[in-house]
């Protein structure tokens, strides 16, 4: 026990016992993951179709990123969903276009698809009422 603990009056209050993990609502989380999977499939298909700049290496990289997230989402639905797996999935998800920047001409149809993916991703980050 350090002097700071004594100063703050926490003498003997150290509790290093493990914290019980909060259980996730498996059915609800799988349903959310199913929605995200469908949205990602739609976005990837649209990104890989004309008039998208598929000859641009950066664009191809973004398609690969979303395909990776799609694979992770599919895999998570087939096993017990954990908080760590959800964090890993959602932490790497980013919008297709930078907010506040103009969207390149001809790619406006991708904005609602990307927004849907990000909205569903943010919902996965929030605890459900059944998980309280």
For each of these PLM feature ranges, what is it?
Residues 21-24, 28, 41-132:
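Long, low-complexity or tandemly repetitive, helically biased scaffold regions used
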Residues 1, 5-21:
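Low-complexity, charge- and small-residue-enriched intrinsically disordered regions
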């Amino acid at each position: 026990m350090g002097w700071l603990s004594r100063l703050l009056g926490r003498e003997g209050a150290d509790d290093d016992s493990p914290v019980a993990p909060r259980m996730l609502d498996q059915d609800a989380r799988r349903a959310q993951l199913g929605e995200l999977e469908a949205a990602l499939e739609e976005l990837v298909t649209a990104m890989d179709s004309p008039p998208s700049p598929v000859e641009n290496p950066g664009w191809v990289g973004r398609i690969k990123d979303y395909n990776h997230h799609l694979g992770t989402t599919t895999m998570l639905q087939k096993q017990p969903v954990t908080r760590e797996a959800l964090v890993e999935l959602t932490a790497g998800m980013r919008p297709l276009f930078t907010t506040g920047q103009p969207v390149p001409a001809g790619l406006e149809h991708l904005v609602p698809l990307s927004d849907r993916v990000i909205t569903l991703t943010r919902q996965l980050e929030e605890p459900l009422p059944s998980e309280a």
